[in-house]
UniProtKB/Swiss-Prot annotation:
Protein name: V-type ATP synthase alpha chain
Function: Produces ATP from ADP in the presence of a proton gradient across the membrane. The V-type alpha chain is a catalytic subunit.
Organism: Anaeromyxobacter sp. (strain K)
Any one GO CC term of the record: proton-transporting ATP synthase complex
Residue ranges that the Swiss-Prot or TrEMBL entry lists as coiled coil: none
Origin: domain of life: Bacteria
Family to which this protein belongs: Belongs to the ATPase alpha/beta chains family.
InterPro entries per the UniProt record, alphabetical: ATP-synt_VA_C, ATP-synth_a_Xtn, ATP_synth_asu-like_sf, ATPase_F1/V1/A1_a/bsu_N, ATPase_F1/V1/A1_a/bsu_N_sf, ATPase_F1/V1/A1_a/bsu_nucl-bd, ATPase_F1/V1_b/a_C, P-loop_NTPase
EC numbers, comma separated: 7.1.2.2
A GO BP annotation: proton motive force-driven plasma membrane ATP synthesis
Protein residues bound to ATP: 227-234
GO MF annotation, one: ATP binding
Gene3D superfamilies documented for this protein: 2.40.30.20, 2.40.50.100, Bovine Mitochondrial F1-atpase, Atp Synthase Beta Chain, Chain D, domain 3, P-loop containing nucleotide triphosphate hydrolases
Record-linked CDD domains: ATP-synt_V_A-type_alpha_C, ATP-synt_V_A-type_alpha_N, V_A-ATPase_A
Length: 579
């Protein structure tokens, strides 16, 4: 089916003569066959958002409908790849066309020439259905790739073709003539089905103490990370990609500056995976849409990333989907909405911004897959609020749809406190659900310690305001002890070095032991001050400096060091009280 162009407005064009077309159908626009998607239908007229630059299009040029929705290719070869927002392989396109891509450039997302050794797990006569395991695809230098039956497919196996196969060649034939290849296609806007959702009672461990202990998120949960320029969003996301409890990382760079994306593309291949010792990129899929790329492709990029994440989830993997940033995605949505002449909402964003964000974040979750395995997609969405204003619409809509806020503070970043997570603003809605896991796995009393630490930090904020007015020396020893204990907690526990091998990640058991010792120091020093021991004498023991060095110790050495420090603390305080 084909029509003709009758109207153009930036990336949005209108074609007539497409009476049989459907919503979200992919079309090819103009003589250069630019990729587009139908977003509105009125009679035989279709409004199309074009995923490439539309300059030079002329009225009357042909528009050809494909009969298919916008879909991604899923199969062996995804890991380690870099795509744009509509899953065009950027490295292959750069090799063919140079650093600047021409319009209409198109290549299959997965390499059709590469052969994979297919080791089948089914035999003729077996009955298979969606989610069932077909086998494993292997290739030199690539991780093993589990091949599963696409959702909605059911049948009895009539023939199995093992051995060297390309991704588009039939590997399993079913009765009735249906064929299954290593490759499948899936519409990006349609969530992949699962057998059932599982309760969110297992944490998504990030390796960052401030997140895991104070603001945990469940596996399959959602978190929003608002932060202005220079607050460390990219470094935090790299730390999460490297140390978080995820088998696969899908990183979506949505509308960020080209220089920042170039830096990410340059640094990610050099990051070492601590699990395997190989490059981190080997278990990462990157989707890159810089701010100078067409806004329509920016809008589609987060759905492309989500479809890929759900595909790996259906293999029984834990997937971390990181979007940087949803603000740029919302700005693309605002621009497209304005081109469509829709009624604007707050700050010009479309009125359906909240429902679109909620529908997207609802695709996260920990599930039992159709094949009976357990998989999860955990979403971490960065937000770039103008001027750090958390009351703007994108941040507020994200907060209503997600389970945690990890707010990054410019003030902490300027003080070189990383991760610059502001504990006075951040929150989690899942702390109570995950408390049982931390009590079992980290240590009994974990929740009580966390609450005590947060009260200490809150008390420090109150006293800091008083100290600014009257000076620290005017405070009583008990109040100055609160300031000192909170300083030790901030610098020795909440702050973490991404460059220190022992401190870059922290298991829950180490974090529990550290937190218990910090708070024990505060309580026992408080008792000594109450008994008349001068605070200066307690500080002169040097035990505070030893507390700060706990973070630099490997996890296995922390219990012994903590026991020695606890004994020295008892001895020092007993001596001071006896004097």
């Amino acid at each position: 089916m084909s029509g003709t162009l009758m109207r153009m407005a930036g990336p949005t064009v209108v074609a007539e003569g497409l009476s049989g077309a459907s919503l979200n159908e992919v079309v090819r626009v103009g003589e250069e066959r630019l990729l587009g998607e139908i977003i509105r239908i009125e009679g035989d007229r279709a409004t199309i958002q074009v995923y490439e630059e539309t300059a030079g299009l002329a009225l009357g040029e042909p528009v050809e409908a494909s009969g298919e929705p916008l879909a991604v290719e899923l199969g062996p070869g995804l890991l380690g790849s870099v795509f744009d927002g509509v899953q065009r392989p950027l490295s292959e396109l750069a090799a063919r066309e140079g650093d600047f891509l021409g319009r209409g450039a198109s290549l299959p997302a997965l390499d059709r020439a590469r052969a994979w050794e297919f080791e089948p797990a089914v035999a003729p006569g077996d009955r298979v259905e969606g989610g069932a395991r077909l086998g494993v695809a292997r290739a030199p230098g690539a991780p093993d790739h589990l091949v599963v039956v696409p959702p909605g497919v059911t049948g009895r196996v009539s023939e199995v073709r093992g051995g060297a196969r390309r991704v588009d060649e039939p590997a399993v034939l079913l009765d009735g003539g249906a064929t299954l290849a290593l490759l499948e296609r899936w519409p990006v806007r349609r969530p992949r089905p699962a057998r059932r959702r599982l309760p969110p009672d297992v944490p998504f461990l990030t390796g960052q103490r401030v997140l895991d202990c104070f603001f945990p998120v469940s596996a399959g949960g959602t978190a929003v990370v608002p932060g202005g320029f220079g607050t460390g969003k990219t470094v935090l996301e790299q730390s999460l990609a490297k140390w978080a409890a995820a088998d696969v990382v899908v990183y979506v760079g949505c509308g960020e500056r080209g220089n920042e994306m170039s830096e990410v593309l340059d640094e990610f291949p050099r990051l070492e995976d601590p699990r395997t010792g190989g490059p981190l990129l080997a278990r990462t899929v990157m989707i890159v849409n810089t701010s100078n790329m067409p806004v329509a492709a920016r809008e589609a990029s987060i759905y492309t990333g989500c479809a890929i994440a759900e595909y790996f989830r259906d293999m029984g993997r834990s997937v971390a989907l990181m979007i940087d940033s949803t603000s740029r995605w919302a700005e693309a949505l605002r621009e497209i909405s304005a081109r469509l002449e829709e009624m604007p909402g707050e700050e010009g964003y479309p009125t359906y911004l909240a429902s679109r964000l909620a529908r997207f974040y609802e695709r996260a979750g920990r599930v039992e897959t159709l094949g009976g395995a357990e998989g999860a997609v955990t979403m971490v969405g960065a937000v770039s609020p103008p001027g750090g204003d958390l009351s703007e619409p994108v941040t507020q809509c994200s907060l209503r749809a997600t389970g945690a806020l990890w707010a990054l503070s410019a003030d902490l970043a300027h003080r070189r406190h990383y991760p610059a997570v502001d504990w006075s603003v951040s929150f989690t809605l899942e702390g109570d659900r995950l408390a049982g896991w931390f009590e079992r796995e980290a240590g009994d009393g974990f929740g009580a310690l966390r609450d005590e630490a947060r009260k200490l930090l809150q008390r420090e904020r109150e006293l800091a305001e008083v100290a600014e007015l009257v000076g620290t020396e005017s405070l009583q020893d008990a109040e100055r002890l609160v300031l000192e204990s909170a300083r030790l907690l901030r610098e020795g526990f909440l702050r973490q070095s991404a460059l220190d091998p022992a401190d870059a990640t922290c298991p829950p058991a180490k974090a529990f032991e550290m937190l218990r010792l910090f708070l024990e120091w505060h309580r026992r020093a408080g008792a000594a001050v109450g008994a008349g021991v001068p605070l200066r004498s307690i500080l002169d023991t040097g035990l505070g400096a030893r507390l700060l060095r706990l973070a630099q110790l490997p996890a296995a050495e922390v219990p012994g060091a903590a026991a020695a420090l606890r004994a020295d603390l008892s001895e020092a305080l007993a001596r001071l009280e006896a004097e």
